[in-house]
Regions:
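Short alpha-helical interface patches
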Residues: 18-19, 33, 78
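Major-groove DNA-recognition helix of helix-turn-helix-type DNA-binding domains
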Residues: 25-28, 33-67
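A detector for short, charged/polar N-terminal pre-domain segments
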Residues: 1-23
């Protein structure tokens, strides 16, 4: 896991629910669905240095393949929540 941060109990529960559906590494199209956004928005977020952490895998394409570790998506979803009273 990135930054050696452990998942909270809430994050572990969400991760365990999503893992059988999406796998440990999530492609951009599924990440966009999970975050209810577009692939273009994910691209802009990466360029701005915001959003979930991602990995760029080497491939035959000139730009490589971008994937998102599921634990980073879970962390992003839960840590970007605003707590209300």
């Amino acid at each position: 896991m990135s930054n050696n941060k452990l998942l909270t109990d809430e994050q572990k529960e969400l991760y365990s629910l999503m893992l059988p559906i999406y796998g440990a590494m999530v492609k951009q199209n599924n990440t966009a669905k999970i975050l209810n956004t577009s692939i273009a928005t994910l691209y802009r977020m990466r360029k701005q240095g915001i959003g979930a952490s991602y990995k760029k895998l080497e491939s035959n394409s000139k730009n490589g393949t971008v994937v998102y570790p599921l634990q980073e998506i879970v962390r992003y979803i839960t840590e970007s929540n605003v707590k209300t009273a």
